[in-house]
């Protein structure tokens, strides 16, 4: 009976340890890490823009600006911030996000359910696409056009037909993330702004999970005079490996490098402490097993009176 009870206790404790270890492993996988960043370069803009999209190509920044009656597409010099050329969009359209596709730019519109394909060489519209719902942000991952519509869903579209191939839901620590806005594709990673929030998310393009995030509040706090002048616009710079970011009606564009945040060490220390506790408890269990085995070997065998004859 004593041996059976000891075995049961050991099994229960071992099972508890396995659940604890599994929980810690799941926690380390699912939780989005906060990363830090540093500003390595700043470019003043010649004119402010109600920024909706941002792209870098061949030493220039391409920037789309929204608002009815004020929408446009600009090419901006990456050294001076001066406007090289500008294309005015029809007053009936509210321009949204942009992305480079081959030698053209795909531009979304907000509520008009229309996307334009614009020739980069002369800023002329060469093709139109229709889609259902609102258009917010867009990027090209080398295979699909990835598009947001202000919800927690993003769609992956055929670059030739603009038809939806599949959609995924964006989740942050298991919760859906609404208001996904400007997008930037870098390999299998998607960088995204959230409308009205000072945060940039890194999203896994397969699962939709947020992998890490940065909070550029230190930059946005120096920009804008009203609630609409929010962080919006992300462009990957292949030459530096950094990201250009800006916002609506901002006076500057910033090149940032993303790095690990010092505060993550606290999370790592906590997880390390949890692992140490698990190992310590497991060691105690092993010691109890050894002591129990040693005691059983040295105790005299108890006769089985039930089976003996009188």
Where are these regions (language model features)?
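Conserved beta-strand positions in repeat-built beta-propeller and related beta-rich domains
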Residues: 62-68, 105-112, 147-152, 192-196, ...
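Short loop/turn segments that connect beta-strands within beta-propeller blades
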Residues: 77-81, 119-123, 159-162, 204-208, ...
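Blade-loop segments of beta-propeller domains
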Residues: 81-117, 125-135
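Secretory targeting signatures
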Residues: 1-29, 264-310
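Blade-level signature of beta-propeller repeat domains, shared across WD40, Kelch, NHL, RCC1
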Residues: 233-268
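Beta-strand-rich domains and repeat architectures in extracellular enzymes and scaffolds
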Residues: 40-72, 87-88, 92-99, 247-249
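A short helix->beta-strand "capping" segment at the edge of beta-propeller domains
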Residues: 28-48, 80-82
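Beta-rich, blade/repeat-based domains predominating
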Residues: 47-58, 91-101, 131-144, 148, ...
């Amino acid at each position: 009976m004593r041996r059976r009870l000891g075995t049961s206790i050991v099994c229960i404790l071992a099972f508890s340890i396995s659940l604890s270890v599994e929980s810690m492993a799941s926690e380390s996988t699912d939780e989005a890490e906060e990363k830090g960043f540093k500003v390595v370069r700043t470019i003043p803009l010649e004119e402010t823009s109600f920024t909706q999209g941002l792209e870098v190509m061949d030493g220039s920044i391409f920037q789309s600006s929204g608002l009815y009656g004020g929408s446009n597409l600009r090419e901006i010099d990456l050294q001076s911030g001066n406007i090289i050329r500008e294309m005015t969009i029809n007053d009936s359209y509210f321009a949204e996000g942009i992305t480079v596709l081959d030698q053209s730019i795909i531009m979304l519109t907000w509520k008009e359910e229309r996307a334009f394909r614009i020739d980069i060489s002369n800023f002329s519209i060469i093709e139109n696409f229709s889609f259902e719902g609102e258009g917010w942000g867009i990027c090209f991952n080398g295979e699909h056009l990835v598009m947001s519509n202000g919800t927690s869903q993003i769609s992956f579209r055929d670059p030739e037909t603009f038809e939806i191939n599949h959609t995924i839901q964006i989740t942050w620590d298991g919760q859906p993330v609404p208001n996904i806005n400007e997008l930037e594709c870098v390999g299998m990673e998607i960088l995204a702004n959230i409308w009205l929030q000072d945060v940039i998310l890194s999203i896994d393009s397969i699962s939709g999970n947020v992998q890490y995030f940065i909070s550029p509040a230190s930059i946005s706090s120096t920009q804008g005079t009203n609630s609409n002048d929010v962080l919006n616009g992300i462009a990957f710079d292949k030459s530096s490996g950094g990201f250009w970011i800006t916002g609506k009606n901002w006076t500057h564009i910033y090149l940032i490098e993303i790095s690990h945040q010092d505060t993550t060490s606290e999370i790592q220390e906590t997880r390390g402490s949890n692992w140490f506790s698990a190992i310590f408890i497991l060691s105690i269990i092993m010691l109890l097993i050894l002591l129990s085995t040693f005691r059983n070997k040295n105790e005299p065998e108890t006769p089985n009176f039930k089976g003996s004859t009188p």
